[in-house]
A protein has these predicted regions:
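Inter-blade linker and blade-boundary elements of WD-repeat/beta-propeller domains
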Residues: 1-2, 29-56, 77-120, 141-149
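Catalytic cores of eukaryotic secretory-pathway lumenal/extracellular enzymes that build
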Residues: 2, 6, 14, 18-20, ...
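Loop/turn segments within WD40 beta-propeller blades
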Residues: 3-10, 53-63, 113, 122-128
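Structural hallmark of WD40 beta-propellers
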Residues: 9-14, 60-67, 76, 127-133, ...
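Generic preference for well-ordered alpha-helical elements
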Residues: 10, 15, 19, 46-50, ...
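Contiguous hydrophobic segments
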Residues: 10-14, 38-45, 55, 72, ...
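Short coil/turn segments within WD40 beta-propeller repeats
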Residues: 19-23, 72-75, 137-141
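Intrinsically disordered, low-complexity acidic/polar tracts
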Residues: 71, 118-128, 132-136
Length: 149
């Protein structure tokens, strides 16, 4: 479905799949088409297709990581630990729709219907904590890595 080469280590390729799996390949390894890291049901893989993956700047612990977004409504960061791929949920995209006028006089009332399907994201070049998320519903949301959930 999607892929992204690491900007500093171009042999590392992050891949997002239609079944919700994310993987990392080392393309220097000849004749081996197995990933060096792979998400599983036990490691909280996405439950819907992954539409975008993107390497992030390495965190303070110097672990490499990348982000993924899926139709399941989750933006997740994946940390490459020594022997495993460790997920951390960044945000859940809540699907909100305005109430019917007949049900409420207050136009600001809203129902939460579940999770919005995430399609794409991009990081702000000047404020590394900020990023935009595009959803299946055609909405664009300003998000922050500083606040999760």
């Amino acid at each position: 479905m999607c892929l992204d080469f690491h900007p500093k280590f171009p042999a590392l390729l992050a891949v997002g799949c239609y079944d919700g799996t994310v993987m990392v390949f080392d393309i220097r390894i000849k004749g081996n088409n197995k990933p060096i890291y792979q998400s599983t049901v036990r490691t909280a893989k996405h439950t819907d297709p992954v539409w975008q993956v993107r390497w992030s700047s390495d965190d303070a612990t110097k672990n490499m990581s990348f982000y993924s977004i899926s139709s399941d409504g989750r933006v997740t960061t994946w940390n490459l630990m020594k022997n495993k791929l460790e997920p951390e949920e960044v945000i859940k995209l809540k699907l909100v729709a305005e109430q019917d006028k007949e049900l409420s006089d207050n136009k600001k009332d809203a129902f939460v219907y579940g999770l919005a399907g995430g399609m794409c994201f991009d990081f702000n070049k000047f404020h590394d904590q900020l990023f935009l998320v595009g959803t299946e519903e055609g909405k664009i949301h300003l998000c922050s890595r500083a606040y999760s959930g």
